[in-house]
Every structure is written in C-alpha cells, then in structure tokens.
Amino acid sequence: MPTWMSDISGLIDAHSPDLWFLSYVCLEILAVTLVIDAVMKSRTSQGAVAWSVALIAMPLVVVPAYLMFGQRRFQGYVRALREGNIKLRQLAQFVIAEMHAKYQPQGDIGSDWPSGKVLEQLATMPFTRGNETHLLVDGEQTFNAIFDAIEQAKDYILVQFYILRDDRLGVLFQQKLIERAAAGVRIYLMYDSIGSYGLSRRYRRQLHRAGIKAVAFRTKPINFLGRLQINFRNHRKIVVVDGEKAFLGGLNVGDEYLGRHRRLTPWRDTHLVIQGPAVQAAQLCFLEDWHWLTDTLPALNWRAETRPANQTVLVLPTGPADETETCQLMFVQAINSAQSRLWIVSPYFVPDEPVMKAIKLAAFRGVDVRILIPGLADRKVVQLSGYAHVVDTDIDGVSFFSYDRGFLHQKVLLVDNDTTYIGSANLDNRSFRLNFELTVITRDRAFASEVEEMLVEDFSHSH
C-alpha cells in the first residue's frame, strides 16, 4: 500500500468514532428535514404520520426509502405540462374545443345525470356522442382484434403498455409492428421502464432498426431527488390505429395474458375497442405522455367520424401529476352515484378510507353491491390485504365473491343499468395516487347490458 494511503487510513481509524457520530448527526438532520417535507406534501394524514415516525426511528433505512418512494408528485411531468411546448397546449385546446362544439351529447349531461358533469371536470374533457364500443373478453380476443387493426393500418399506430415482454406474444407483436413499419406506417411505441424491466436490448434494437420510434417511460429528473424517484409508473394500455380505432383496458403484452403462465392460468381480463370521437381523447392522452418523453409532436389524424351506435363515452386519464387525486375521486363519484346496482371487479382490492366509506354508504342506500376479487393471487401480500378489507366491509348489502377459474385481472365497474367503467385502474393506493391510469366510462344501456352478461358469467365461476 502506498505511504499516502496508509496515512489516510490511519487518520480515518484515529477519528472514526467522531466521523461516525458526525455522520449520524447529519443523517438525523436530513431525516428531520424530510419529516417536514413529508408533513407538508403527503396527500394523506396517514402517510404523513407513517413517514414521520419511520424517518425519526430508523433514519438509516428510511431516508433512502423516502428519497426513492416518498415524493407525492411526479414533479418533472407537472413542470413539463405547465411550461411545455405551446404547440401541445394549443393542440389540446383545439381538440377539446372540437369535442365540445361537435360531439357533445345534446342538452346538458349534468341535468339528468349530475355525475357526468363531475366526471368531465375530473377528465378536463367532455363526454362525446357518436361512439361505438365493443367488449374484448380475455387475451385471445383482444390481441386478435389488435393485430387485425395493425395489419390494416395505413398511416400511423400509437402503442403504450405498462408491460412489454420479449416472449412469444411480445415477439409476435413486434413482428406485426415491424411489418407495418416496412410498409411505411409510422409507429410510436411507449413502454414503462419498470414494468418492462426484462425487455431485452436485442428486442429494442430490432424495433429501432425497423424505424419504429420506441421510448421507455421513466422518471426524467429535474433535480437530484428526481433522479432517485422510481415510484411513479405509467400503467396505461393504449393502442390507436390511424386515429380511427382505440384499444384500451387491462391487458399488457406478455404470454401470461394469453393464459400461458405456469400458475396464473387461465387469465381473465377485459379490454375494449372504441370507434368515434372518443378516440381523439385517447390520442391526446398518449400524445401528452409522448411529448413529455420526447419533446416531439407527431402529426396525427384529428378528424373524428361518428358511429351509428351513438354511445356516450368519456376517456378519463388520471395520474400523480393531477392537481387532485383524480383516480380516487372517480371511484368515489362512481360509487356515490349508484342507485340500484354497484358491481366492482378488481384484482387488487385495497381501497382507502373514503372509498370504503362510499361502498358502505351505497349498501346502506339499498344498492346491490357486489365485489369480485381473485381467488388465485399473483401477489400474496396484496391478496391478504384485500381479505382484510373484506372482513372490514362485512355488512349487510355488500356481497364479496372470490373468482375460482384462474387469475382475475380485469378492472370493471357496472353502475345501475347504464354506466360502465373499464380501464387500467385498480382499487388500490398505487392507482389512486402513484400510477398514470386510463379509464373508459360508457353511458349506454345496450353496452351496460353486455357488461352485465359478462360479469354474470364471472360470478358463476366464483364463490
């Protein structure tokens, strides 16, 4: 060992008690500073108390954890939306104005359905008429429909998934996109960097070589703390073809979604396909995420065509960049609006106190409340937490069902006989406060009847 290194080592050894003490004092000062941050910024009192106690009691462990998971807002995204390209803001204003002027349901939607006005405020977009929505039950039906649409694409394809795997389905999906790219179709692909963590470099390189613009959704830091943030994930699932068809719902791209998982099979999930003006809202949601990641705005088709089915649809994006807890409020409003029926299906049923109280109040009103959760779990801790909420909601009027026919992953609400909620959001804290989600709200009796028929079948495979 060189002489100078020996001297430094000896100096550290001689003063190590003082250095350890000084380090601990600095850590405690940082912990106290973060306690103030937690109290000021946590969205719930429970979260503020939990972080504060843990930071003071175990600073060595909890300080790094808070820096990675404790921030309540996706500040980089928030700043980008507020200070971003003026062209994006102008485009969003134009699209929303067109929806209001040309495609809003006749009359005031809030006059006979007060929830409609509330949901529009949460979405910052209006319900649109002239839509046609079809259920896609499970993976085979969903991906057959998506692949058919991709094969017919003429101009562009927008793709966004939380999970994109390099397995049989993922490779087939890649091949379909590469074929259309070779035909001159523009393809824009987003995947979440954590959800798609195992995606191989070879897979990504093949996409880029084919001319497909593929980017990973990850925290784009605006400061040092932002570099440590991994807690905010983009959980949305979107495929838009030529601005004419949008596929939205609960399925990602992986073999398990086709029932090929060794343990979680068959896989029960729900997606839907939309045609009509609501497709423009799905495009706008995709474009905001794309612009935040790439600072680019691809030219898209914003000419909507109405469909004979004339369904009323709202596409409602939610996420940690919102000014309020939009996803939680959406669920609370849906539950509070129920007059005769409230059927909830969620793979992760870990609601917070406001949602639990809303469910109990619905039961007290005499609403037929049914909650379907998985019998087979992909995450044991989450399942046990869900069962704890089942026990807590053990009151007359709330019926819980456990799905027995494989793994249940769909996220569906059926309210009364005319309103459905289908999308990517779970009834848990991640969806309420941490994930970017997307839910399609359809107000149409015929479509609600289809959803009812689907859920009755699911209840028949439950106990």
What are these regions (language model features)?
Residues 345-346, 403, 422-423:
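Thr-Gly-centered strand-to-loop micro-motif
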Residues 383-384:
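Active-site-proximal loop->helix
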Residues 205, 358-362, 388:
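Short, solvent-exposed amphipathic alpha-helical segments in soluble enzyme
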Residues 411:
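Catalytic-core elements of nucleic-acid end-processing and repair enzymes
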Residues 1-329, 333, 337, 377, ...:
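N-terminal localization/anchoring segments of enzymes in phospholipid and broader phosphate metabolism
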Residues 348-370, 374-375, 379:
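Helical hairpin unit composed of two closely spaced alpha helices linked by a short loop
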